[in-house]
Amino acid sequence: MLRRLVQQWSVAVFLLSYSVPSCGRSVEGPGRRLKRAVSEHQLLHDKGKSIQDLRRRFFLHHLIAEIHTAEIRATSEVSPNSKPAANTKNHAVRFGSDDEGRYLTQETNKVEPYKEQPLKTPGKKKKGKPGKRKEQEKKKRRTRSAWPLSAGAGSGLAGDHLSDISEPEPELDSRRH
């Protein structure tokens, strides 16, 4: 009976020690440990990507700075009034591996550093100034304004045209109402 009591106590102590959290961890420790490992792995992956991106940016910045200083050195050696050599041309320079297929042009005679152009905001097109019209439009307007004057029956005097304009015809009057 004593032997059986010892076995029961040992089983009870074993179960209690296994299920009681050690060092403040809960019962489901292995499951949380796996989740934490996955999130930690993803964090390290993202950190590695950001470090790689930072290295790439630093490399490109350093490369551009070398090109810029090379341009400054080349222009400082040349006198300010001299013309550039006739055989200098803009040649295509390849960066990166052959499978990228990206070509960047190098302007050898350029003195100013590169400045990004501001993006154009889409908007309405600007209209021309209202005071400036093309000659053809002016002629068309003149001929249109001359039609009612020449079409009126009369002696051609200015008084006749004024009487035509001041007294509306019955057909035109019916259209207005």
From Swiss-Prot:
Annotated region described as Important for receptor binding, given as residue ranges: 57-68
Q: Which residues form the propeptide?
A: 25-34
Q: Which GO terms describe its molecular function?
A: hormone activity; peptide hormone receptor binding
What is the protein's major site of localization?
secreted
Motif Nuclear localization signal in this chain: where?
A: 108-129
Give the GO cellular component terms, alphabetically.
Answer: cytoplasm; extracellular region; nucleus
Point out the signal peptide segment: 1-24
What post-translational modification information does the record give? There are several secretory forms, including osteostatin, arising from endoproteolytic cleavage of the initial translation product. Each of these secretory forms is believed to have one or more of its own receptors that mediates the normal paracrine, autocrine and endocrine actions.
Q: Which UniProt keywords apply?
A: Calcium, Cleavage on pair of basic residues, Cytoplasm, Hormone, Nucleus, Secreted, Signal
The residue ranges flagged as biased composition, category Basic residues, are 122-132
Q: Where in the cell is it found?
A: Secreted; Cytoplasm; Nucleus
Q: Where is the composition biased (Polar residues)?
A: 76-90
| One Pfam family of this chain | Parathyroid
InterPro entries in the cross-refs: PTH-rel, PTH/PTH-rel
Please give the residue ranges the record annotates as the region Disordered. Answer: 74-177
Locate the compositionally biased regions of type Basic and acidic residues: 109-118
GO BP: any one term: bone mineralization
Q: How does it assemble?
A: PTHrP interacts with PTH1R (via N-terminal extracellular domain).
Please give the function described in this protein's UniProt entry: Neuroendocrine peptide which is a critical regulator of cellular and organ growth, development, migration, differentiation and survival and of epithelial calcium ion transport. Acts by binding to its receptor, PTH1R, activating G protein-coupled receptor signaling. Regulates endochondral bone development and epithelial-mesenchymal interactions during the formation of the mammary glands and teeth. Required for skeletal homeostasis. Promotes mammary mesenchyme differentiation and bud outgrowth by modulating mesenchymal cell responsiveness to BMPs.
Report the family membership. Answer: Belongs to the parathyroid hormone family.
* The protein's name: Parathyroid hormone-related protein
Q: Which organism is it from?
A: Oryctolagus cuniculus (Rabbit)
